[in-house]
Amino acid sequence: MFKLVTSSFTAITLSIFLLSGCADHSEALKVLPNELAIADQCKNTNKKYEMDCYDLISYKNSFAQLRLGLNAQLNENYNEALQRYLVAKESGNFYVNSLLAELYNNGFGVEKNEETVIKLLEEVKDVDPIAAYKLSYNYLAKQDYKKAVKLLTYAAENNVKPAQSELSKIYSNSEIIDTDLEKSIYWNDLYQDKSDSFMKRIYGK
């Protein structure tokens, strides 16, 4: 059984992560593909079997922790989700930042904290297309459209489906940037092709 820790310890732990400055993700980029391949071996149509398999390898596999945390979040077990995400983050899995940001954005098991959300996403925007996609909305809200489109393009090029859809909409009218129907159709065609989804690849669903 996964042992839960206190909220105060959680806050301190996350603060340490965020105060550590710009992380060097080079080592993680070397080991994470192998961890992902191992975690993918647990995928099964029998979801209980799949979760049990993740649980068995979670002590040494950050993607197993991430997916167990996501399952806990979907079942509204936010405290467990938070702890598992923190374990995965401590292990160097930067893909969990987006999920932590979601908890803080919605106040799931923690107090809402927009500053923490932005810091979590900014930390990994250059290595995690999902984080880049989510962060783009912050720049859209600030009307910094150049940065927003740059983030969306990075995400879309890496098959983050919602980013492809958003770019298609952006290029279909001149509200944000000049209309480019060719690009709009291009991104919509990629969005409609569901054969390769980056989010599904990372989250397992």
Language model: regions and residue ranges:
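Classical Sec-dependent N-terminal signal peptides that target proteins to the secretory pathway
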Residues: M1-H25
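N-terminal leader/linker segments that initiate helical-solenoid repeat arrays
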Residues: C22-N71
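Short helix-capping/linker turns of helical repeat alpha-solenoids
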Residues: T45, I57-S62, A72, E90-F94, ...
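Hydrophobic/aromatic packing residues within the alpha-helices of TPR/SEL1-like helical repeat arrays
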Residues: C53-Y54, Y85, L121, L152, ...
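Hydrophobic face of amphipathic alpha-helices that form TPR/SEL1-like repeat modules
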Residues: L66-L74, N97-N106, A132-A141, E166-N173, ...
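Terminal, low-structured helical/coil segments at or just beyond the last alpha-helical repeat
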Residues: D178-K205
